[in-house]
Amino acid sequence: MGKKVAIIGAGVSGLASIRSCLEEGLEPTCFEKSNDIGGLWKFSDHAEEGRASIYKSVFSNSSKEMMCFPDFPFPDDFPNFMHNSKIQEYIIAFAKEKNLLKYIQFKTFVSSVNKRPDFATTGQWDVTTERDGKKESAVFDAVMVCSGHHVYPNLPKESFPGLNHFKGKCFHSRDYKEPGVFNGKRVLVVGLGNSGCDIATELSRTAEQVMISSRSGSWVMSRVWDNGYPWDMLLVTRFGTFLKNNLPTAISDWLYVKQMNARFKHENYGLMPLNGVLRKEPVFNDELPASILCGIVSVKPNVKEFTETSAIFEDGTIFEGIDCVIFATGYSFAYPFLDESIIKSRNNEIILFKGVFPPLLEKSTIAVIGFVQSLGAAIPTVDLQSRWAAQVIKGTCTLPSMEDMMNDINEKMEKKRKWFGKSETIQTDYIVYMDELSSFIGAKPNIPWLFLTDPKLAMEVYFGPCSPYQFRLVGPGQWPGARNAILTQWDRSLKPMQTRVVGRLQKPCFFFHWLKLFAIPILLIAVFLVLT
């Protein structure tokens, strides 16, 4: 009989964890607070306490070929960037296809997870749950925490003097659902993240006036990239990652800023980040630049002070007659069912080895799935995290010593601060991270070997999109359809758009894409070498 594993949450992280446990012969029991799977992607017309909440118009920022489970592509006719209802439809189909629903206890709230008295030798946990007012406790050999990090809103009211005197409505973006109730209103959105920009542009169609207040600015990217292809299929590549991590810093930074300004010059729109070379996750919004051009959205600096009816910005300008302030100020990390000694934090950083395992426990029998954030998609990331975690729980994989894990955490955190900034503690380099995890379980593709044995596939794997299928090519959980999925991914990305075919479809040429991007720096390097 396999080890018993408690899984908290039935979103994409929880479903991936159930499947990974089954692949390793473990016995999963998943506890889900609501009455359905999907987590973040399950829309509700009201925000529920202790559960992620989205607005009705949410679309994905990752394209379908880059955000699927590695052995379960999205249907061919699904659009590249999907409405939340389409993603929920896909999640349900995945759960049914993999026969996962029978392992989930719905409407069950996990109230506490505690070490058993003999934890130092057994690694076991007491898990207490509540359902219909009744409490139950059970012993589990391991726990996988899949409750997400978009649950507890960060609403820093103390950072805004005078907010307590403001007479209009004031709430966090998690409580925003649709724009109709803001017809003719004057709205201030605080925060220039994905939610803030989405809400501001959506409200601009019905509200009288909309302003966005940003403390530090942000890069704003379009989902549509060169020649109309999805951005991530062109930018999230192994070759691109190699260049980014090996070019001289000055050239890498210059290229990054040039890439971010390819669509429009951010400085002219008041969007330029304070430190533009930091690789903080950009905002994905196709409407914001046009909304600013048309004057229906204005960008302002940080709010210095609120009055009863207005906001005074740091540049001295005033937005008067405000009806509503929406704080799109992100979320805080919290695991209320766990003792603080289990998952420690410091300086807004949760201390986890590779973003998954608490390093200071006697036994590595608790894992956090879905806590990292990157330019890559969540679903393939949590799939790989859960596969690794399941192997560690089973005993197939072993972790380094506590000292080695802490040294790795400290080293990585220094690199993160340099690359992403001090506040972006859960950001990571997607391909580097995925290769690291896949190497632990023997699922990392061997690129040199591929070039020798299957050059056609190797070219697509190295120069093409780093799609999820790459991490089911070899090793445990290998998917026989992975090779074909990689070679046909461009066809699937084009199919939903070909409702009026006007010519022969052509795949992008990776060589010319990168040559165009690096033409100037290559020329500069050549001149430098000649002169020296």
From Swiss-Prot:
Catalytic activity: trimethylamine + NADPH + O2 = trimethylamine N-oxide + NADP(+) + H2O; N,N-dimethylaniline + NADPH + O2 + H(+) = N,N-dimethylaniline N-oxide + NADP(+) + H2O; hypotaurine + NADPH + O2 + H(+) = taurine + NADP(+) + H2O; (S)-nicotine + NADPH + O2 = trans-(S)-nicotine N(1')-oxide + NADP(+) + H2O
Keywords from the UniProt entry: Endoplasmic reticulum, FAD, Flavoprotein, Membrane, Microsome, Monooxygenase, NADP, Oxidoreductase, Phosphoprotein, Transmembrane, Transmembrane helix
GO-annotated biological processes: taurine biosynthetic process
Residues bearing the modification Phosphoserine: 401
Mode of membrane association: Single-pass membrane protein
Subcellular location, principal: membrane
Transmembrane parts of this sequence: 510-530
E.C. numbers: 1.14.13.148, 1.14.13.32, 1.14.13.8
Subcellular location: Microsome membrane; Endoplasmic reticulum membrane
Isomerase keyword on record: no
Assigned GO CC terms: endoplasmic reticulum membrane
Top-tier EC class: oxidoreductase
Cofactor or coenzyme needed: FAD
An example Gene Ontology molecular-function term: hypotaurine monooxygenase activity
Binding site for FAD: 9-13, 32, 40-41, 61-62
Family the UniProt entry places it in: Belongs to the FMO family.
Role this protein plays: Essential hepatic enzyme that catalyzes the oxygenation of a wide variety of nitrogen- and sulfur-containing compounds including drugs as well as dietary compounds. Plays an important role in the metabolism of trimethylamine (TMA), via the production of trimethylamine N-oxide (TMAO) metabolite. TMA is generated by the action of gut microbiota using dietary precursors such as choline, choline containing compounds, betaine or L-carnitine. By regulating TMAO concentration, FMO3 directly impacts both platelet responsiveness and rate of thrombus formation.
Protein name: Flavin-containing monooxygenase 3
Source species: Pan troglodytes (Chimpanzee)
